[in-house]
A protein has these predicted regions:
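Short N-terminal amphipathic alpha-helix/helix-capping patch enriched in small hydrophobics
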Residues: 20-31, 44, 49
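Amphipathic alpha-helices of TPR/Sel1-like and other helical repeat/solenoid scaffolds
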Residues: 27-33, 78, 82
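Divalent metal-dependent catalytic cores for phosphoryl transfer on phosphate-bearing substrates
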Residues: 40-125
Length: 125
């Protein structure tokens, strides 16, 4: 049920912004289906789904700091927000580290270094 708890936490995080909530649910759904179809291990699938749910967590702090949701600002500010949330929900350190990396690079298409990254990018389109 950790995934449900994370989705609920992100719904709370984006309270008042239904388009962001709908987007994270869409990206999570696409990533989940693609990951299952690709035959990811249980651990890889969890990491992918967590990343898909929090991938845009940097939008809110980017708006607050820069009055913009530019992808580079999301990549700059998103990892710290993701780490804070995932620690609060007791995710393990290795998962948090990789998810923070993915959040910090999900608008950088020239550095794709794994299937989780590739699927996240594709699900986000």
């Amino acid at each position: 049920m950790k995934i449900n708890d994370l989705i609920l936490a992100m719904i709370d995080f984006y309270q008042g912004h239904p388009k962001q909530i709908q987007h994270l649910i869409k990206v999570h759904s696409f990533a989940r289906v693609i990951g299952i179809d690709e035959g990811l291990s249980t651990q890889e699938q969890e990491r992918l789904e967590v990343a898909a749910i929090v991938h845009d967590i940097g939008i809110k702090p980017a708006w607050e700091k820069y009055n913009s949701s530019n992808g580079k600002y999301q990549e700059e500010l998103g990892p710290a927000e993701a780490i804070k949330l995932l620690n609060r929900l007791n995710y393990d350190e290795a998962l948090i580290e990789r998810v923070a990396y993915l959040v910090g690079h999900h608008h950088t298409y020239s550095e794709i270094d794994g299937l989780d990254y590739q699927i996240l990018v594709e699900a986000d389109f």
